[in-house]
């Protein structure tokens, strides 16, 4: 973690000229270096970028304008212990979900049901209405997937939980919306600067999948008992990678596109109920991020899936699941979470703070100056190194001047381009 922080502070673009050297063989060191290499790739590949920053700020502005509440600082202190004890079903769209649907139906009154991403279509087909639906993408794909359910009245029974950058059209589909800032994103950092510290909470591990967001949010709120359905993080059969009731398959159960051709599914992970399963890189990262969250949270997490083994969870066969919670307790916990953990921002006050801090005229002038940094021709590798350093210094200076959005818009994209 110290090395990751150091790379961020000096500029991730230095990865282009970074090398790993081991002076002697040590298995523990080999593993650590391998993990560091993967995490450094994640910093670049999954970092912020111009479009995400631009749309994130626009969508957050819309959310505040339409009175959508945001997660408070240290949210677990705002929820009573009795509510934290209510079980939570995290429902992903992995292949194991098909076999676990009967258990979800059987225990529906004893838990808070949270559907994640494309799992919503599967739950709808089986007559299950979740209390919350989680989404994480800022683009409009979350709207397009949801309307494929083709049941607007069904969606209006469900509360949406998401990050602050969620698309406004997606928000309009649901009964109500509850948001959390996502740490490290331009929209989060730029808006956090407008308010005193300890005003809002922010999620540190809400990536790369929506399951990571849901688990990060709900463990941060303080819930203590989780059951994982369809969060496989891998698959036994490469042709059976999601629930067959979802949009990845036809009504006859055939793949709508060649999943293995589009994804490298050759990675191997230890299995939850079997020695090994296959996976793809995104799921491998997702598993690792989730394991880091569970290592520091006080929660009992049961993994019912025939997928990847997840450190910090307990393998649980569906026939061994026993829940003790009433529907009344569950409903009280849902209501308490909505009322006590999230709060609205005054839009007029927000807009005043924002306009006082960020001047669009300064941004336009800085963009003109930034453009002049680029010479018509680069004659050597040294010229390129100088240019990269000048660009870095320029955007950092803008950040320190505290009157422009230039750093928030360009930092992630520059890091990506200059580390290639």
Task: Name every feature range the model reports, one short phrase each.
Residues 25-86, 97:
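Aromatic- and Gly/Pro-rich donor/ligand-binding loops
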Residues 208, 257-308:
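Polyanion-binding loop/helix "lid" in catalytic or ligand-binding cores
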Residues 69-140:
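Secondary-structure-rich domain cores
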Residues 134-143, 147-156, 180-184, 243-262, ...:
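Acidic, Ser/Thr-rich peripheral helices and adjacent loops at domain boundaries
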Residues 117-121, 162-168, 305-309:
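Short, polar loop motifs at secondary-structure junctions
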Residues 1-52, 124-213, 219-221, 379, ...:
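Acidic/Gly/His-enriched mid-domain segments of enzyme catalytic cores or analogous surface patches
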Residues 292, 296-420:
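Long, compositionally biased charged/polar accessory segments in the mid-to-C-terminal portions
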């Amino acid at each position: 973690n110290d090395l990751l922080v150091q790379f961020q502070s000096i500029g991730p673009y230095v990865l282009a000229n970074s090398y790993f050297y081991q002076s002697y063989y040590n298995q523990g060191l080999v593993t650590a270096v391998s993990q560091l290499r993967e995490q450094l790739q994640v910093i670049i590949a999954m970092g912020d970028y111009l479009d995400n920053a631009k749309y994130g700020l626009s969508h957050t502005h819309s959310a505040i304008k339409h009175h959508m509440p945001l997660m408070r600082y240290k949210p677990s202190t705002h929820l009573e212990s009795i509510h934290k004890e209510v079980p939570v079903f995290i429902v992903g769209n992995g292949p194991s979900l098909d076999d676990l649907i009967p258990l979800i139906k059987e225990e529906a009154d004893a838990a808070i049901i949270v559907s994640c991403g494309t799992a919503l279509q599967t739950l709808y087909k089986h007559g299950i209405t979740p209390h919350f639906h989680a989404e994480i993408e800022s683009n409009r794909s979350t709207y397009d997937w949801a309307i494929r359910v083709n049941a607007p009245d069904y969606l209006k029974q469900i509360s949406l939980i998401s990050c602050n950058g969620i698309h406004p059209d997606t928000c309009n589909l649901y009964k109500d919306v509850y948001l959390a800032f996502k740490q490290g994103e331009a929209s989060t950092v730029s808006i956090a600067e407008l308010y005193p510290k300890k005003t809002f909470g922010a999620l540190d591990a809400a990536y790369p999948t929506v399951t990571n967001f849901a688990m990060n949010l709900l463990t941060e709120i303080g819930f203590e008992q989780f059951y994982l359905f369809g969060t496989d993080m891998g698959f036994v059969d490469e042709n059976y990678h999601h629930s067959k009731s979802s949009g990845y398959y036809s009504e006859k159960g055939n793949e709508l596109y060649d999943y293995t051709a589009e994804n490298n599914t050759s990675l191997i992970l230890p299995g939850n109920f079997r020695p090994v399963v296959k996976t793809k890189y995104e799921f491998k990262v997702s598993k690792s991020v989730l394991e880091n969250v569970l290592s520091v949270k006080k929660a009992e997490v049961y993994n019912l899936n025939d997928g990847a083994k997840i450190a910090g969870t307990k393998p649980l066969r569906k026939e061994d699941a026993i829940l003790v919670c009433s529907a009344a307790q569950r409903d009280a916990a849902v209501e308490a979470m909505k009322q006590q953990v999230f709060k609205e921002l005054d839009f007029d006050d927000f807009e005043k703070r924002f306009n006082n801090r960020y001047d669009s005229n300064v941004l336009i002038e800085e963009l003109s100056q930034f453009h002049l940094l680029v010479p018509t021709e680069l004659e050597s590798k040294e010229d390129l190194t100088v240019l990269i350093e000048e660009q870095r210094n320029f955007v950092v200076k803008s950040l320190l001047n505290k009157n422009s959005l230039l750093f928030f818009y360009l930092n992630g994209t520059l890091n990506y381009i200059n580390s290639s």
